Structures are given as structure tokens and as C-alpha cells.
Amino acid sequence: MDLDFCTVCGATTQDGSLYCSSECHLLDFTKLDTQTTSNISVSSEYQFLVSEHLAHFHRKSMTSADFPTPRFSAYTKLHA
């Protein structure tokens, strides 16, 4: 594997360096910072949507019963 090329622009490098210049070195870190910020934003949006989804179903279960509750149990009807 030939490592004599800049990882940012593809220009030739000296001594097997990853970057051909300090500008490419800074550009590479700028890309990483932008990607990290983007990932954090997506992650927080995802967490918000999940929490809203769970809160919706929690509210729904608190306001309406899935099954009607009988006034008397079967035990009461049999032994009354």
C-alpha cells in the first residue's frame, strides 16, 4: 500500500505523512468536527422523537382503558 498521498486532496506527501500541507491537515479536522456536530444533532432529534412516541402511548394508556372494567367480578355474581 502506497502511503505517499495526502488523505484530503490526493497530492504527493513527503516521508509517508498523511497530509501534504498544514491546510489539508486543518481541512481534515474541520470535516470531522462538522460530522460530529451533525451526528450529535441527529442523535438528539432521534432521542426526542423516541421520547415523544413513548409519552404518547403512556398518555393514551392512562386516559383510556383497553378493556371495560366490570362493576362486579365473576366471583361476586356466582356467590351472591
UniProtKB/Swiss-Prot annotation:
Main localization category: nucleus
Keyword Nucleus: yes
Induction remark: Up-regulated transiently when the growth phase was changed from the log phase to the stationary phase.
Segments crossing the lipid bilayer: none
Cell location: Nucleus
InterPro entries: Ecl1/2/3 (IPR024368)
Top-rank taxon, per record: Eukaryota
A molecular function (GO) term: zinc ion binding
Pfam families associated with the record: Ecl1
GO (cellular component) term, any one: nucleus
GO BP annotations listed: conjugation with cellular fusion
UniProt keywords, alphabetically: Nucleus
Function, as annotated: Involved in chronological cell aging. Extends cell viability after entry into the stationary phase probably through affecting the Pka1-dependent pathway negatively.
Similarity remark: Belongs to the ecl1 family.
Name the record gives this protein: Extender of the chronological lifespan protein 1
